[in-house]
Amino acid sequence: MLTPAGQRRLMELQASGGDFGDTGKSFAGATATVVIVTRTEIYCANAGDSRTVLSRAGRAKEMSEDHKPDNSGELARIQRAGGFVEEGRVNGMLALSRALGDFEYKGSPNLAPKDQVVSCFPDIRIEQIDASVQFILLACDGIWDVKTNQQAIDFMMQKLYKGNFSNTRS
């Protein structure tokens, strides 16, 4: 789980505004979906439009939310921060509303990193582990643009139970 200390460090890194010293300022960005599994629980932290889906008895259980600009909560934060959404994109450009980096959307000195036009603050979800948990699938938006959660789980179950990943690409 992203501890309070880990959350603070993430916020500090984002607050640096992408200043990497001698190498200059970076405007690149990335999504992150992270899973930690203990004996009894699965923790998922997500920022962006990568997604984590749990297979529980063959049924897809979404463990993360896609952070898209047209989501009502994300849209409200973007607008409060002085941004706008046009054609499903932050300020008409970025197709997601949370990310690491993308510092050109995080320049308001009066706002905390989690309240910027594009936030770095992850959602965190927890699921209990029981005998019905089979596997966890983490993938980028390229998969989710063409497969539903259940289709992706069905595909993976078919490959797992056949033991055949030779034609599978990551």
Task: Label the model's feature ranges.
Residues 1-170:
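PP2C/PPM-type serine/threonine phosphatase catalytic domain
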